């Protein structure tokens, strides 16, 4: 890192780039070359080589550390600052804006050296900021010209001008940079390629005549892309997009693969089906019938000639081709489809079903060839208009094929689309991580640079200290402030411009300067975030001491303690320099400005852990601070050295804590004790600010300032921002905007202030807002006179109230302060608009102003946290995603222009192909606006219909390409955009408790006061009654303590973030810790001074207060842990356990100890008490003795019942009954009347079921007792459902069955299946998860409703009553405006008995409710076209609509779709996913959608790779078999099989519907060849692998496929000859597709994704079950309500609610919200002439075919919300989860594949699969592995050091080796332990045998033993020698002593080693001499494992231990 500091920062680092510099560079390069030998040069670009400094990249701004550029150096060549380029030929140029441009120092175009004046000039022009502006303007103007559809002639010259400017730009760039050879030249930048191509094309089209010019002209559109290259922020975004596309490669491959497979299936199943049409029987003709029959019999080979040559008068071909002979439904372009199978669509009387004519939708919807099938499948996957495809296919092929669609929708659509989502989300996450890390690294580098400045700073320090001593007033109440703004940068993607920051700063300055005049009355109770920042230093007096006390001990840290304030404001790049946090996960959290070492508070990972910040006791904390404002904090300024901080000690003395100088001479001033008012504090704060400013301007300061350039910058920044407003403005503001002229006025002001600022007034205003909203929502059409007058009066009143509120507030606060606050500005804006609107009420066309009143709704946000949050999220996202949105806009623009240029003319010329009356349809590309609308519609996911039109007029290939590009690119960007939105500005932290953390807002205070008042009255009444009646002291005594408690609670509302005392009481604390002022009752609660002292004296103290949400009582004080750093870790762990219960008030302990997360009641064999204790206490009769008499009998009865109820057979029986009774409901369709026997059976069954359920209920009552029964929610559900049955039974018995109420009750029987919920574990789990999410879903739903309300009211204002039109009701056509202009003319027609009718559109905006429905249709993109057409055509009330008269009303819908649909629906997805993640955390990270059983399956899947070493399949002894074996096991064999599979797939794709006989035969033989080949493969493998063949899963799969293929061939022959069942035949052919699936085996990426799917299956199964249950209930409900509805629009003979099957088919379609508008439309018919209420239905007593609009709307809306939002999103949540798990698994350093490899190698060394290997072979084994596990030779030492346990025979177990090797790869870590435990579990599961081998020793011990043995041997030899030589015995004794000393030491080592390895509880293991240590003791790591299901293993361990003892 030091390399980046080579160039000294500061102004002296800039040097001109001269010839000498160039020479020096050349010399360095030469030296470098000479130094290095040739080979090394190749590895030059190695990863570990030096990298360019990312801060000095071209295009970035110069970092602040370099200070200002001397003016003479601007735009001049300078030497490169980046050390990386020290030996590269480059130089840099800086412009005025300090942007870095880097150029190559070689000659440009071989002639211009860097010193050439021409090149210098070019460079000056290029880097000038205006140059970019010019190009930008040119591009934009050019874009405007491009949007013209028929440009006039003079535009040609304009074109030339543009081309000229672009050419000039490129020339400048080429002159300045060079063309293409060196780095940093023109063509080295990909963005310049774009320019180059654009210009070349411009010239080419000009001078060369190329024919189709319009196609080439479209290339000009790419100029719009140049905007991207000009705006710096966009480049990064585009980079990000490209990154995420790269990431998508795997998913794309999988998607294409799956779609191909499904398309092949579709091809086989539905080939040619969609051409079946209903043909009219020809004129009566006997020969025809013969022909027809022969036609059907020979249908496979008819050639189109007439069949019967004898009859030539009838030409079948011509007859079929004539369209008029087909059956058309009215209004349809395509003939009615039909099918020949029993469950397909039938033809009307007189028609037969024949395959003829073209396919539907211009012939583009079909499965006839692979390509069309693929398109259809792609359409299914993107779910665009798929209901149409679904209905056509089911009609033509039969309802059974619904299964195909279910599979494709669930596996294809939901799964694949969401996988794309998951991948994109992950790409984003990774990018965010990367930017964070980069920022961290930068901070470290800067820290080093700052150290270089240390010396300069120290000099400045002395001067500063002296200066501070001169100025007495320098000290302030809380530091002098440069106010940091890090909250604005808190959003991950935010790149707010410095301008904004400066403006904010400017506001603050004004505030501060005016602050001197601020008077006491201007106390504001509720301030927004902004004003909080303005209030300056949020830390309290003591807090500041705490923060800065230890700071000066290490001088170089001081500067960075102000982490973001110095550097961030001027940077424009995405991650501002210091805006990140080191170890804290949440960006922008509490201690951004504390040093890492001396962090004020321990960094806690959870944001909810509140901080203990003692607050200044004179200052009320402003109320409405939201989450973000915590991140915005005040920062004390740095006088020159940045080291002087002021602190206030406990006596109120302000001292300057600076370097030693400041400490030794503490200059301070006593704050007056207890008298300072809040205002004075504030005043003092602002005045001190002035002092600091004057101080800085003092001339004597200048020298010191020049010492450290960094500070110069900061100060300049201050002065600049201060001078933004000239001083005269402040004078003016003080004079005119602050009103405090005379005493009486001040008194008035004071009174007004008291009134306006009172919480009750706030409450009243809020109520007014709600009422006003209601009034606006009550408008409807048609309204009576009185009603509208009431509304207008109401509006006047509300306008008056709001105006009054505004004026009073202005009086109370002074205009200056009033407009300092965001909400007030907002109010002011709305009030002035309302007044304006009153003035302009009579002017036509300004009714739009009325919709501005709607913005008042947003005032609710002030007191409604979730709404506030939503607005913030949208605000943040719009800001943060500004760049992305821009990219999207550019893309939309480009495609709109391309569409217009390419297809505009064709639409005009070929319009008759797509429109009956040869008028341009609504969706065309002839003009730019319409082209834009089409592109927008494609982005909404509706591309297929417009594409058909396009293909019809402009040719298939071009249209397909353009539309697919828009679809993929646009949708990817949109998806990216909203994902980024959700990821960056949305986490449930802000959802759950936005405002809990801050002081209660005024509403809560007001409500609290009311509550208090009510309590007080209640208490007084109670006391009075007790005094009057019960004159007992005791009663009073009982009340007293409670009362006290209440008082305490009320008087002190503690708060999460800070412990603030006495909020309402505004008292002050004087120096001695007593309280003066109001509220002595609070004295007990004042935190004692000593607490603060402990803070101050021990800065390392931290307090963590874990809190449960939503509780704000003082009890939180008891949970604090005052702890020093030493026990911090522990409390952190505790916290992580407790704070995980976010969102609930109950802490669920970590489930680690083995208890289930849901604590179920203990299974006791005794029933519980019948009644609750309270009941027993009040009614003595409830208490029965169970010891004797009747009581005992009763008790025994209960015990018996309990046994019955608890028996699992009982439960099974009940479940069976529930299923039967639910099944019975499915039979009650419209045909039940005709099937009398079934009807009577059902009636009896119904009674039986009811009795059984009543019996069950009674049994449970007796067994469980009422208390237990009625406290269980599931029991309540049972109870209510049984009640319904009971009531209807009694009603039937009494003969009231025909009553309306009873009938509607009967429909409630549809809820019966709900009882199955509690019985099926899987569904119950999901429902619990859902219920957990309901609060936050409801919250967001409410917010969305408010949001939509605005659009709805706006819609009512714009369109109410304007959708009426006059139609001819026989033809259904609308009269033209020329014929009928208005209502009265229509009436005239009606009266003259014409067939006319004045009719409304069914879904309209006549009132707010219908408005909501319309908006829902628009948001789900279903039925939105009709609504939009009506809106666009509308003129005025009672006027006949005119085609596209009101064209720009489209924009209303576009805006709604963006905000109402994209934002709010995505927000839902965000909330749901987030919620489930939170619940998951709460349940200890397990999946909340799985039952225990399924979790086991899931874990098994996860551990799939854990295989035990298998015996390799032995090579057969037989010579022939051996040869085959060798051939089959070669890799070539596998690869060739794969190639064959691919070829087979291709041949299957070639098949088409209308292929010739010849082709069919060829394909038949090819297929035969493939079958033979695959059978051959199968046989070869069987020969060589013998019975082992079936041990491998894939082989079994292959085998089955081969068998099916062979059987299929024979069956196909049989079926063709004997049976005519084409479906069966087709299904059998599908078997061939199975072969393709074998490809999966080969592709790793696809395997990962499918693995993720496999892992999601259990959870998805549960969710699927729940979805089925919901569908079932709704189907039955639909059958009982809508069975007889008129068949029109979406309801017809196949898709209706008449039978259970049909209902399910319809509901499945709506699950994806497809086509629900069509099903709803007929149900909205409420009376004639739309439907006939008296119509008879044969065979049924029901009359009429009208629907019930209210029931229908409720039915569909609720179903859509439940299924679409909930289920689909749960699906998403599960997939995202498992996808990340699967990718993590594949991304870990050791994947399953590595373990497989380990075992494969193992098999060679351990052929008998003993699981052990001899120690001598270990070295070879380690060398034989592949990396990363490989340990190359020489590896003996490493292996010995691994200390592996050995068993007798010097053998080592494979697991131990694997552990040791993985440890080597992963390093020591917690993960390692987890992995080890996991592997051991897997192993134990598969090999119980392992335990029996007891290790005796380890490799290390073995080595030590060997060494010891050698030592002993040597000693003994020496001893013998000594004996022989007969030396003096004393020497011998000495020697002996040495040996004795030696051995014990060795033994100690061994013992230590053993203990080190053994687990804590087994430390009593004795040295190895007594008995072999247990296997566990040698292998287990230090950390104890807590696996509950491994109890048997533990027991074994215990036995071993006991035997040792």
Swiss-Prot record:
UniProt-annotated stretches for the region Binds SCN2B: 917-918
Modified residues (Phosphoserine): 4, 468, 471, 484, 526, 528, 531, 553-554, 558, 573, 576, 589, 610, 623, 687-688, 721, 1506, 1930, 1971
Gene Ontology CC annotation, any one: paranode region of axon
Post-translational modification remark: May be ubiquitinated by NEDD4L; which would promote its endocytosis. Phosphorylation at Ser-1506 by PKC in a highly conserved cytoplasmic loop slows inactivation of the sodium channel and reduces peak sodium currents.
Bias type Basic and acidic residues, positions: 511-529, 596-610, 1933-1964, 1979-2005
PROSITE patterns: IQ
Site (Binds Mu-conotoxin KIIIA): 330, 362, 916, 920, 945, 949, 1374, 1429, 1443
Stated role: Mediates the voltage-dependent sodium ion permeability of excitable membranes. Assuming opened or closed conformations in response to the voltage difference across the membrane, the protein forms a sodium-selective channel through which Na(+) ions may pass in accordance with their electrochemical gradient. Implicated in the regulation of hippocampal replay occurring within sharp wave ripples (SPW-R) important for memory.
Protein name: Sodium channel protein type 2 subunit alpha
Organism this protein belongs to: Rattus norvegicus
